[in-house]
Design a protein with these regions (language model features):
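N-terminal FAD-binding dinucleotide-binding subdomain shared by FAD-dependent oxidases/monooxygenases
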Residues: 1-257
Length: 257
């Protein structure tokens, strides 16, 4: 089973994982698969048109559901694509002036995908507050460490490949990387470990330079993007992520005995 899981993980990484970071041939396959699934399951051309996005596949997070197309075609379901203008006592009024009466309104508007450790208070060296460090944009070194915050490590931090690969797999690889750093402290070799600012700057510059090739910057609005339109995603291959997480380069860290 482990071998099967590893094989399927690598297959996914070599198809979808490459599609989202600029492999046009793989992206075409993803889009063709999504389109064929829609056409096979929704016969009404008007509804099918409403269900067809006006942005590239995977620009927003793809949702895999075995029953959504069947549910949306039931007599008691209606797909409304008009923007919401306001919520009134009797229901929701859309921008075309139509009032959609309802008994219950469920606000499934998502979450803050860029909060990470916030709103928890985290104070680093010299009293620096994480909220201030991340006031404009969220960055970390290799997604797990922050300059000026010794002995602090996180899983699934900024620019982790949450939109490319299995969240479980990437968390396990990040944890293995972090544990190698913690073992230095447990062995008494160091008292403090934190990312060097220059190393973090180089890492984040490489992320920014590669992001222009990805699907996340092709024009849609999603929770992948921060307020400046920067995706907190991983713009490289699965193999590179695995290599980066195999062992820490101690030259990238400030080690205090």
């Amino acid at each position: 089973m482990d071998e099967l899981h590893a094989s399927l993980t690598h297959l996914f990484a070599d198809t979808f994982g490459r599609a989202v970071i600029g492999d046009k041939e793989q992206m075409q396959r993803v889009e063709d698969t999504c389109r064929a699934n829609l056409e096979d399951n929704v016969r009404d051309p008007e509804l099918r048109a409403k269900l067809t996005p006006d942005y590239q596949a995977a620009c927003k997070r793809l949702i895999i559901s075995p029953g959504f197309y069947q549910a949306i075609q039931k007599p008691n379901a209606e797909l409304v694509t008009q923007p919401i203008d306001r919520v009134e006592a009797g229901g929701v009024r859309t921008r075309d002036g139509r009032l959609h009466g309802m008994d219950v309104l469920v606000l499934a508007t998502g979450f803050d995908g860029h909060s990470f450790m916030r709103p928890m208070d985290l104070i680093g060296r010299d009293g620096v507050d994480l909220k201030d460090v991340w006031a404009e944009t969220t960055q970390a070194h290799r997604s797990i460490s922050l300059p000026g915050f010794p002995n602090y490590f996180m899983l699934v931090g900024p620019n982790s490949p949450i939109g490319n690969f299995s969240l479980i797999d990437i968390s396990e690889r990040q944890l293995s990387y972090i544990m190698q750093l913690i073992e230095l402290w447990r062995g008494g070799e160091v008292n403090e470990i934190s990312a060097r600012q220059d190393a973090a700057d180089r890492f984040n510059a490489s992320i920014k330079a590669a992001m222009g090739n990805t699907v996340w910057v092709t024009g849609c609005q999603s929770w992948y993007l921060d307020k400046h339109g920067n995706p907190a995603m991983w713009p490289f291959t699965f193999d590179k992520f695995c290599a980066d997480m195999s062992a820490p380069d101690l030259e990238e860290y400030e080690l205090v005995s």
